[in-house]
Amino acid sequence: MRGLSRNSGAAAIFAILLILAVHNWSVAVSSQSTEFAGDFPPFETECRGTIAECSVSAALGDGGDLFYGGGEMGEEFEMDSEINRRILATRRYISYGALRRNTIPCSRRGASYYNCRRGAQANPYSRGCSAITRCRRS
C-alpha cells in the first residue's frame, strides 16, 4: 500500500509538470504568430521611439513611417502648439503668462512665475530653523 501511494504521488507530479510544459509550449507557439490577439500588438523589433510611436507602428505592421508619412493613426498623436496651450491652460500650476507665445513669463532671476516682482523669492523658506535643516540665519 505504501509503494502504491508513492507511485501515485510521483505520477501526479509528473502529470502536473507535463500539463505545464504543454501549456508553456502552446503559449510560446501562439505568441510567435504575427496576428494581433490581445490588448497589445506584438513587437517584432526593438523600437527606439516613444510608447505611442512604437505601439502605433507595431499595430500597422508594415514598418512605414506613420508620423511623417501621413498615416491614419499618426494624426492622433500629433498636437500643434495651440492645442498644447489649451491643455496646459486647464492645469492650476501654469500661469497664463507662461502660455503666451514667444514670451518669457518672468525675466527676473530667482523670481517665481506667479510672483514676478523685484525682490520676490521663487521658493521662500517657510520651515522653522534647526541644526538638522541647516537653515540660514539672518
Swiss-Prot record:
Q: Which residues form the propeptide?
A: 29-88
Q: Which domain of life is it from?
A: Eukaryota
Q: Signal sequence span per UniProt? A: 1-28
The alphabetical list of record keywords is: Brassinosteroid signaling pathway, Disulfide bond, Hormone, Secreted, Signal
Q: Name one GO cellular component term.
A: apoplast
* Pfam families membership: RALF (PF05498)
- All disulfide bonds of the chain are 106-116, 129-135
* Induction data: Repressed by brassinolide (BL) treatment.
Predominant localisation class: secreted
User: Which terms does the record give in the GO molecular function aspect?
Assistant: hormone activity
Site positions (Required for proteolytic cleavage): 85-86
GO terms for biological process? brassinosteroid mediated signaling pathway; calcium-mediated signaling; cell-cell signaling; negative regulation of growth; response to brassinosteroid
- What family is this? Belongs to the plant rapid alkalinization factor (RALF) family.
Q: Protein name, please?
A: Rapid alkalinization factor 23
Which species is this UniProt entry from? Arabidopsis thaliana
